[in-house]
Regions:
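N-terminal glycine-rich phosphate-binding loop for ADP-containing cofactors
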Residues: 1-172
Length: 172
């Protein structure tokens, strides 16, 4: 989840890629428009972001996030590929802070952290209450954060706060 590293990799890739070659990058919340800044027109037309949900082998949702210049055929191809070969439910998301799933998920986790503190809940109690019993994955809250990485959670939460300065709930 480091924009500078992704941009360095894309700069190197662009030197070797054939025009028309599709490039994607998995991210939990880095804006796609920032990832392909400075890249050629062809690169931008054939570039988009992807977001697999963790644990990826169990969770079926697959977000595809186009950049401002991504060609519609790229989205169509990736959506079909995700469904046919990866067994995923593909969703086209707008390039908004943290896209769809993580925008909702981070808000939910941050809200839950306040409840944990206020109600003095244990990790086990939280995961029991925030998993399948409410229609969420078995990994629930804390196990999901463990799989994803606390550093990623913090990075995405900070990105939302930075990119949504007028959000009335940003103090979470």
């Amino acid at each position: 989840e480091r924009l500078d590293i992704k941009q360095q990799v894309f700069e190197k890739l662009e030197k070797y890629r054939t025009p028309g070659t599709l490039i994607t990058s998995n991210t939990s919340g880095i804006p796609i428009k920032f990832m392909n800044e400075g890249r050629s027109e062809d690169f931008q037309k054939h570039f988009c972001g992807t977001h697999f949900f963790n644990p990826a082998r169990y969770l079926k949702l697959f977000e595809i996030i186009p950049g401002p210049k991504t060609d519609a055929s790229v989205l169509e191809f990736l959506s079909g590929y995700g469904e046919q070969f990866l067994g995923k439910t593909s969703v086209i998301a707008k390039d908004t802070p943290a896209f769809i799933g993580n925008r909702i998920g981070i808000f939910s986790i941050q809200s839950l952290f306040h409840a944990v503190k206020d109600l003095d809940l244990t990790i086990e109690e939280v995961d029991k209450l925030s998993g399948p019993v409410i229609g969420r994955p078995k990994s629930a809250t804390f196990r999901t954060v463990d799989v994803v990485g606390l550093d990623t959670l913090v990075h995405v939460a900070n990105g939302i706060a930075e990119n949504c300065p007028k959000d009335e709930r940003k103090e979470l």
